[in-house]
Amino acid sequence: MKENYHKWHSLKLNREFEMLTFGYSGLPVIVFPTSGGKYYEAKDRGLVNAVADFIDAGALMIFCPDSVNNESWYNYSVHPSERVERHIQYENAILDEVIEFAKHETGFKKVAVSGCSFGGYHAANIAFKHPDKINFLFTLSGAFDIKRFIFGHYDDDCYFNNPPDYMPNLNDDWY
């Protein structure tokens, strides 16, 4: 199976960012790591090997970006507004850097996203907010309510990153 390591300076995060990719063509699937996980977690836990036949056949190409959870939601040394701000920077890095790279590498116009645990939150939140870029969502045991990370702080950025709050109020043509 073709495996590539990527590292670049993310303009959205203003720091180095790492990612592993597996495969050479096929539906691009972005796999988010769990809360404390890194970009190599899906490989280390056997998730990539579980779909190796699809990767080798060119049906799937897997993209495993790093996370910034310890700089955002799990960074209890900063104010909750800074946590959500860092999360938004991460989301923008995924949208503008990772997804665009995945589309370029595969020729697909949209990507699939997946994740377990807090990776499930990232997958679902980005899929719900950006159906123009994402056509499949696979999530398992996601932690979707961010209120436990913001300790009573609540503003528009929190609202628009908390699916249990914004999803019931959607009424536009995207949904």
Predicted feature residues:
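Non-catalytic cap/lid and distal C-terminal segments of serine-dependent acyl enzymes
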Residues: 1-175
